[in-house]
Amino acid sequence: MSDYMINSMQFLYLVASYLFGNILTAYIVTKWRHNVDIRDEGSGNPGARNMGRVYGKGYFVATFLGDAIKGAIVVSIAKYLFEDSTFVMLTLLAVIIGHIYPVLFKGKGGKGISTFIGGLIAFDYLIALTLVAVFIIFYLIFKGFTKPGLITIACLPLCMILYSYSIVTTILSALIIVLILYVNRE
């Protein structure tokens, strides 16, 4: 992405990434299996955690995988088509925004963690593995998932620097983290 300008094909890909993010696995699964809207069940969040609480572990896994694969698909295609890590990180941001604030669902989406995880694995599996190690350390300290998960996510910009990504790519990763921490603040 020379001079950090995007061309028309990249712009269209960003729009498509956002719209692809609008596909909410939890909504599709509950409509198909139970003919209900998951946003009217449990916490009202169309994400893996609410699916697990309302319908059980199998639904948690299905929703997590569906949303993670969504992020991985967007990032993998962007890596293949554009090869620029800054633009690829921008597509990850777009798909996450699409998941959190889906225009097709009047802005009521999930919290973006599953989509982030899948996209990050596709972006750079070494960073993902580093963050898994960080998560394990904090999991052993806190004995739960939420705090270690959020702390681990917050470590992404440090990993970006450690793995020699550009400052612009690192800033984009930090924006993703701020967004995810914001929607997971309660």
From Swiss-Prot:
InterPro entries the UniProt entry points to: G3P_acylTferase_PlsY
Enzyme class: transferase
Places the protein is found: Cell membrane
Keyword Transmembrane helix: yes
EC number(s) on file: 2.3.1.275
Catalytic activity field: an acyl phosphate + sn-glycerol 3-phosphate = a 1-acyl-sn-glycero-3-phosphate + phosphate
GO-annotated biological processes: phospholipid biosynthetic process
Keyword Transferase: yes
Domain of life the protein comes from: Bacteria
Pathway(s) the chain acts in: Lipid metabolism; phospholipid metabolism
GO molecular function terms noted in the UniProt entry: acyl-phosphate glycerol-3-phosphate acyltransferase activity
Any single Pfam family the record assigns to this protein: G3P_acyltransf
Record field: transmembrane: 9-29, 58-78, 85-105, 121-141, 161-181
A single Gene Ontology CC term: plasma membrane
UniProt entry keywords in alphabetical sequence: Cell membrane, Lipid biosynthesis, Lipid metabolism, Membrane, Phospholipid biosynthesis, Phospholipid metabolism, Transferase, Transmembrane, Transmembrane helix
Membrane topology: Multi-pass membrane protein
Major place of residence: membrane
Subunit structure comment from the entry: Probably interacts with PlsX.
Function in brief: Catalyzes the transfer of an acyl group from acyl-phosphate (acyl-PO(4)) to glycerol-3-phosphate (G3P) to form lysophosphatidic acid (LPA). This enzyme utilizes acyl-phosphate as fatty acyl donor, but not acyl-CoA or acyl-ACP.
PANTHER family linked: GLYCEROL-3-PHOSPHATE ACYLTRANSFERASE-RELATED (PTHR30309:SF0), INNER MEMBRANE PROTEIN YGIH (PTHR30309)
HAMAP family assigned to the protein according to its UniProt record, in alphabetical order: PlsY
Family affiliation: Belongs to the PlsY family.
Protein name as it appears in the record: Glycerol-3-phosphate acyltransferase 1
UniProt organism field: Bacillus cereus (strain ZK / E33L)
Gene, per the UniProt record: plsY1
